[in-house]
């Protein structure tokens, strides 16, 4: 059973530092922002930065397929406004190209929000069209849609939404999903008992399909079941407890993909990584 656990590490001072930061906490996978996530534009990646990133990744012994970059929080690929949608699509394409340059094969993103101006279905179609445009203009990078907690007007809280987006994506080989444990719990998919876990995962398989799972975010939840609020907590300190993470660490369906902590206390990441590996039953 091959599990690749890590965390969303800092790329402060340049993306080259991210693999080193991952290595320091004993990670076998990691997530990063390839640019400032709170700004629209960023200067292009320099060749030296790209080469150093690849060298550090190799030195850390982490495969490119175990890196799950996250796009900017500003991007809304389902935006109801035409000008804003175009701006988001341009920014997303830039992020896809950055992944391409860094030799990474996936980019994780939140699907988007309808902002109360269009229907959920229309929003999902816009997200799918945004993905199609980005895939046509790039090669080799998979667009990885993350499930959401369903806060505000965010789409993607219902697994059916993820399936609906994928149905409309032309190149199915370059689209996938990332499942966040905190988000799914907050959206109404229970995973606290073995029975609940299997039932929720069966819904995921039915609505989307296991073949599309390209990563997971392992987070406990500060908020109660079905609260539709996105508040992460450290493992075992929130409403989920340790059991769901034991189920995941012993589930062969989660083999070979990046399993990423986005828990709130980064001082605990090394401990949490050790804890997760200790849950594996031989």
UniProtKB/Swiss-Prot annotation:
Residues at which Zn(2+) 1 binds: 70, 110, 146
Binding-site residues for Zn(2+) 2, renumbered to this chain: 146, 180, 217, 262
Keyword DNA repair included in the entry's annotation: yes
Alphabetically ordered keywords of this record: DNA damage, DNA repair, Endonuclease, Hydrolase, Metal-binding, Nuclease, Zinc
Cofactors: Zn(2+)
GO BP field: base-excision repair
Pfam families: AP_endonuc_2
GO MF term (any one): DNA-(apurinic or apyrimidinic site) endonuclease activity
Protein's job: Endonuclease IV plays a role in DNA repair. It cleaves phosphodiester bonds at apurinic or apyrimidinic (AP) sites, generating a 3'-hydroxyl group and a 5'-terminal sugar phosphate.
Name this polypeptide is given: Probable endonuclease 4
Organism for this UniProt entry: Wolinella succinogenes (strain ATCC 29543 / DSM 1740 / CCUG 13145 / JCM 31913 / LMG 7466 / NCTC 11488 / FDC 602W) (Vibrio succinogenes)
Taxonomic lineage from the root: Bacteria, Pseudomonadati, Campylobacterota, Epsilonproteobacteria, Campylobacterales
Gene of this entry: nfo
